[in-house]
Amino acid sequence: MENKKYKTVLIGTGRIGFLLGFDKKREQPASHTMALLKNKKIELCAGCDTDLERLKIWQKYVKSHGSEGLVFESGSELYKNIEKIDIAVVAVNESAHLEECIRAIEARPRLVILEKPVALNSFEAQKIADCAEKNKVPVMVNHERRFDKNYALAMQWMEKIGEIQRVEAELDSGLRIYAKEFEKDGTYSLLHDGTH
């Protein structure tokens, strides 16, 4: 059996990158940091964030869990200092997905894991797809809830019920539903949570 560990970096130590791992109401692991630390095949070697206070907290936490915990203030700085990356996880605010994902792709890891939504619009998503194709780097969009026990239960019900004719759903995520002006930063529920 191979004992290779995949050298992994995390871009963004905010809500989905780190903080949701402490939410006791969520099925865990609920953040990229916690999932990466839990996986024995992952070597979480570095992270970056523009919030330097949170970055220090992240560093202390991951070091206490056996990670090297190198930290950088930007993706550019990280990629200049970390070589031969296997996996780059992009978990930044939606408004930075295009820039950070392209930067990750151009660093040529073996895989980029991009937090959903892919981008703020289809034009930005296409730029990411084009860059990935050009650099021959696969980009996987994170939809972890499909593995959630509640989603698995819903799938079992759907198999029993048969072909779905209609679905009605309500979502209360605390985010705004949608307005044109929210497209600039992606902070609306339809884009952020609607993909689930």
Residue ranges, per PLM feature:
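Nucleotide donor/acceptor-binding cores
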Residues: 4-6, 110, 137, 165
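Beta-loop-alpha module in the N-terminal Rossmann-like domain of NAD(P)-dependent dehydrogenases
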Residues: 67-131
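N-terminal Rossmann-like dinucleotide-binding module
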Residues: 1-64
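A contiguous active-site-proximal alpha/beta segment in oxidoreductase catalytic domains
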Residues: 79, 119-182
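Short glycine-rich anion-binding loops that position phosphate/pyrophosphate groups of nucleotides
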Residues: 16, 94-95, 145
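Rossmann-like dinucleotide-binding domain that binds NAD(P)(H)
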Residues: 177-196
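Short active-site oxyanion
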Residues: 42-46, 86-88, 188
